[in-house]
Amino acid sequence: MKVVLVSGGVISGVGKGIIASSAGLLLKTLGLRVTAIKTDPYINTDAGLLNPLEHGECFVLDDGGETDLDLGNYERYLGIQLSRDSNITTGKIYKQVIEKERRGDYLGKTVQVVPHITDAIQDWIERVAKIPVDASGEAPDVCIIELGGTIGDLESGPFVEALSQLRHRLGRDNFLSISVSYVPIINGEEKTKPTQHAIRQVRSAGLIPDVIACRCERELDQATITKIARSCQVEDEQVIGVRNMDTIYQVPLLLEQEGLLKLLQKGLALDKCQVTPPMAQKGQALWDLWKKTVVPDRHLEPVNIILVGKYVSLDDSYLSVHKALEHSAMRCNRKLNLVSVDSEHLEPEMQEKDPRKFHEAWAHVVRAQGIIVPGGFGTRGIQGMVDVAKWARERKLPYLGICLGMQTAVIEYARNVMGLKGATSEEFSATAEHRVVIFMPEGSKEQMGGTMRLGSRTSHFKPGTEWSKLRGLYGGVDVVEERHRHRYEVNPDYIEDLEKAGLSLTSMDDQGVRVETIELKDHPFFVGLQAHPEYKSKTLAPAPSLLGLVAASSGCLDEIIEAAHKKQSSSNGVSDVTNF
């Protein structure tokens, strides 16, 4: 077992997740199998009930785990499938230890942070690091661990101590520590004091840094690198500058140029690892494809997409949607111009309350080449989502509704095409006459955490849907799997009437009862999914539905669908370099 720890000092939010993901990608280019773990010091069991405006999105995994958004970064960069146990929280660890104490597993001992909590953390890491994360079914060679928060925070203490002990247990050739720090520029001068203080804390915690990754706005001066190296007791080559790039997808290229891959090879004694020739070839092919895909987009033709949502004041609230659109734009050779619009600003009441916000919001809608409405909860801003779905439907503008976005599209269709006045969702009105969206029978209204329909679920395209653009984007297959996170569904009692009115319900669940996707046949691209396809989008393999939206908005949908069919017909029995 080999571990790469990525920790941070000074401040959070400096890019630990991207650096961790990039380090993992560089290791994969050598033909190694890589997994990832994120530790979070909060006491919540998982991210399922965290406010997206405070913490960012909740990222959902195949097994239904509701996790930190950084796990999405790992999956997107590394092309892997993680599990709920890949996200370790203080809440999970304490719950496990307390349950063991109640069972009597500790035989009457006084249960303490050291050794019981720290041992539990180490045991958890060693167990998860061995879980296969790709189609091969083989255990990973290297585990990337991102330490949430910053070293020195009170709540991070048990994790820091556990990782310090793990470093000692594994030995020098099996544990490499990357410390990420921020180098601010004040009056044109690169300031090194924050980094010096941060590394001093790291050292005092027992995590001697093997690499110091300095986040900065520009390329670091050699004098700054030398100063940091001397004050932190490392060599110059162990200090790498991670400057701002045009896109985050160029960070792996930058880190390779800065010498991180060589440091990883040396620090982990990777020359002793047995990498088969086929795996080495896959690694090189992956690197070649990455470099070809992530070219700068400055000279590409733009495509203007608007995201209409409830939590747009924080970009991280819809991080996976943003990334999936970026992946899709790269695939279509377009520069993504994404504008987020608060759905509440599109509502008639806003015209009286704040005319400027109302007109600005609708101006973005008018200029858009495509519209996406992602998931969400609650009644706020729903009318705005309904109105923008009507705009897209009537003006033949490419539209993609995800989860709540699909449900509001169904509500709009029921109201304005079927003539069902006041049609709505049971989430917004439990007594309305026409509840075209209802609470799922198996859901719980008493307990919120972990009670939704979560994780990977199967959708079956119905016979006669060969015309479906969405089905075409999947390569014309009969069955697909996407991740879900919802409590409400299209009311089965209205399925027949919706289809008679012209709304095609193109796929259903395993039982053929629950609506999974909707489409309009006579529209350039009007698609809704109950699933969250953004969670499975990869940098080198965009989510088909989001790729379809960008392609339709860019005028190349037919080309993309044709390519999907060709890939599907040629992929049988052929391994994918993006997934190993």
UniProtKB/Swiss-Prot annotation:
A GO BP annotation: 'de novo' CTP biosynthetic process
Domain of life per record: Eukaryota
One of the Pfam families matching this protein, by short name: GATase
Alphabetical keyword list: ATP-binding, Glutamine amidotransferase, Ligase, Nucleotide-binding, Pyrimidine biosynthesis
GO molecular function: ATP binding; CTP synthase activity; identical protein binding
Family annotation (Gene3D superfamilies): 3.40.50.880, P-loop containing nucleotide triphosphate hydrolases
The protein's Enzyme Commission number: 6.3.4.2
Cross-referenced NCBIfam families: PRK05380.1, PyrG
Family affiliation: Belongs to the CTP synthase family.
Protein name: CTP synthase
Species of provenance: Gibberella zeae (strain ATCC MYA-4620 / CBS 123657 / FGSC 9075 / NRRL 31084 / PH-1)
Gene: URA7
